Amino acid sequence: MSSQKVFGITGPVSTVGATAAENKLNDSLIQELKKEGSFETEQETANRVQVLKILQELAQRFVYEVSKKKNMSDGMARDAGGKIFTYGSYRLGVHGPGSDIDTLVVVPKHVTREDFFTVFDSLLRERKELDEIAPVPDAFVPIIKIKFSGISIDLICARLDQPQVPLSLTLSDKNLLRNLDEKDLRALNGTRVTDEILELVPKPNVFRIALRAIKLWAQRRAVYANIFGFPGGVAWAMLVARICQLYPNACSAVILNRFFIILSEWNWPQPVILKPIEDGPLQVRVWNPKIYAQDRSHRMPVITPAYPSMCATHNITESTKKVILQEFVRGVQITNDIFSNKKSWANLFEKNDFFFRYKFYLEITAYTRGSDEQHLKWSGLVESKVRLLVMKLEVLAGIKIAHPFTKPFESSYCCPTEDDYEMIQDKYGSHKTETALNALKLVTDENKEEESIKDAPKAYLSTMYIGLDFNIENKKEKVDIHIPCTEFVNLCRSFNEDYGDHKVFNLALRFVKGYDLPDEVFDENEKRPSKKSKRKNLDARHETVKRSKSDAASGDNINGTTAAVDVN
């Protein structure tokens, strides 16, 4: 009788090992991942290790300096310690070239979050290796985003209720969570969840290859972005881990096929759980739909294994759920064809068709005439609220789906005058008018250090898109999207009084037809949609929203949304 360990909350579906044919397909999967650039070089890996070593030294120096300021002796200050942990894709071992490193700085109880954003921030700025830095202290999990020796790093901080943080510390003990506030709990949870996932899969190497493939697939198919209502990296990792538990002896190629089959047929909102949900020592909320109405509202719940268990997919909306399920069905069809030798793995990873899929798009552009750091904060806020706009749009009568794209489009221009800034806002975002921007200097990675550009005033732009599919039986019907769009603009403006300065921060929402999308959303080898010549000019049938005096003064533009959208 087999004594194989059982992983997960149920027994396996199958314990059969891989066949010769399946191993061959697995080899071809790995080759395709290499071809797609999923693996980094040994030198790139060594660079990451060196950067993390420097950050560990900085973490200890940070704790030491804060300790000395609080009148500790030199010996006590050194013993106070400080340690960094990684989490996310790097910790899981599935990072690729250019991936960021999610990094947690753990500090003792006398070091505060304010110290992190002052003392540690200053230590980072002293380093010659620092390329970029953007502190976001007001984020859900307060964060400092940096680029260090060319590597993007997201730094968060957690304070433990103990006087020392030695290098030997691990985070597995639930008692470490005592007496922490919610932000510290959330910060610690990333590393704790990542470590548990690795402990809960039968064969970590099989899991890693399968997860690399799913990450690549999800990015190519534009279903990878927690902020926009799709699963993020941790959620995709847990979904892959659950399939590995059900097929403990399968190779990665088989895991992929079963991944799409099982999840396309899953009885949502039945949760995906890697182990029984645990109680613990804290009076904190643990995911429980029997108690909490909010938990019952989760459409595709994927539950973190580390205490306190949370839903990693609470951001999924009705529209993004539809998109994800469509992609699961496509995955079933293609992987079945791969196993029948009718298609190759490259077919699975083909780019999405988002900008060809819909006739109508809502274009959301955040503008900043100021510093890059100002724009990162403003555009980051706008991005974080797009999901709320999606939820308001998808419940309108006549809208079948409001599908957010997962990647903002970033650009910046030299902008010497206010007239230039107004021109950018007026002409950007439409194929018909975007050539007017050629009169301004576009800032690129290649020219940004030139003296004439480096010191020039700049306008920064971040543009997001929502594809709209309408369900209108009466062709004379129109859909009014003005109210949710206006509420969205007002919400973004309300978060900080600085965002009321319309000479610096602006926000434009425009209703754009597929053939009028700007060139930047298409690859060079893609043929952009064209306007059908036989169709009547529908623009004349649009009832344009007239800007109120306050809107005109503010500089916000919601004209392009049109209050009554003609969807014919």
UniProtKB/Swiss-Prot annotation:
Keywords: ATP-binding, Magnesium, Manganese, Metal-binding, mRNA processing, Nucleotide-binding, Nucleus, Phosphoprotein, RNA-binding, Transferase. Residues 536-550 have a biased composition (Basic and acidic residues). The record marks 140, 145, 294, 314-315, 387, 392, 487 as: Interaction with RNA. InterPro entries: NT_sf (IPR043519), NuclTrfase_I-like_C (IPR011068), PolA_pol_cen_dom (IPR007012), PolA_pol_NTPase (IPR048840), PolA_pol_RNA-bd_dom (IPR007010), PolyA_polymerase (IPR014492). Mg(2+) 2 binds at residues 100, 102, 154. Coiled coil: none annotated. One of its GO terms (cellular component) is mRNA cleavage and polyadenylation specificity factor complex. Residues 525-568 are annotated as: Disordered. Binds 2 magnesium ions. Also active with manganese. The modification Phosphoserine is found at residues 452, 550. Mg(2+) 1 binds at residues 100, 102. It catalyses: RNA(n) + ATP = RNA(n)-3'-adenine ribonucleotide + diphosphate. GO terms for biological process: mRNA 3'-end processing; sno(s)RNA 3'-end processing; termination of RNA polymerase II transcription, poly(A)-coupled. Pfam families: PAP_central, PAP_NTPase, PAP_RNA-bind. It is found in: Nucleus. Belongs to the poly(A) polymerase family. Polymerase component of the cleavage and polyadenylation factor (CPF) complex, which plays a key role in polyadenylation-dependent pre-mRNA 3'-end formation and cooperates with cleavage factors including the CFIA complex and NAB4/CFIB. This is Poly(A) polymerase. The gene is PAP1.
